[in-house]
Amino acid sequence: MTKTVKEIVSEIKAKMDQAGGLKHVYFVACGGSKAAIFPGLYLLQSEAKTFSATTYTSNEFVHATPKELDNRCVAVICSLKATPETVEAVKTANAAGAVTIAMTGSMETGMAKVGQYVVTYSNGDDQVYSDSNQANALRIGFELLKQFENYENYDKAMEAYAQIDKIVAEGKKKVLPIAQKWAETYKDEPVFYVLASGPN
């Protein structure tokens, strides 16, 4: 049986209390997964009072491993299908003594095999957004804040999760006709320029 984020963080809290307390949380991934874990990072950087948080790309984490990585750190490492360098990042964190939470698409991935704790998330065309990688990275952040610092906005945050799927469904319904009209209007254009930016 898989554990809930609340249960996972409860076990981590017991370990950290014995080790001297949580000092740092690393969010590690690459590509779209790195963008997806940004909400958890941003939450902790903004709200945590007694520990800090940073992000690394998977390969950077493996080849320029932070010196403070040890048994008082948590590494939240995300990859849908277990990108090789991200699996290596989990192994690197394990070897340093950190607690690893492998966020991945299923219990059969390489990530699930090497993570100390595993959080699977919804993905694909029928994705449940309240259980997506973004939502779970944020959920881990809220749970760390609650259990380590008794975060005052925790209950409001948990209530908000019940609204996410309805909001997304309504948004899709409103935007679909606009998107279809745009696609029909510009379908024969010879060139498209796509501009994008990362989360930070």
Where do the PLM segments sit?
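Internal, active-site/partner-interface "lid" segment
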Residues: 144-184
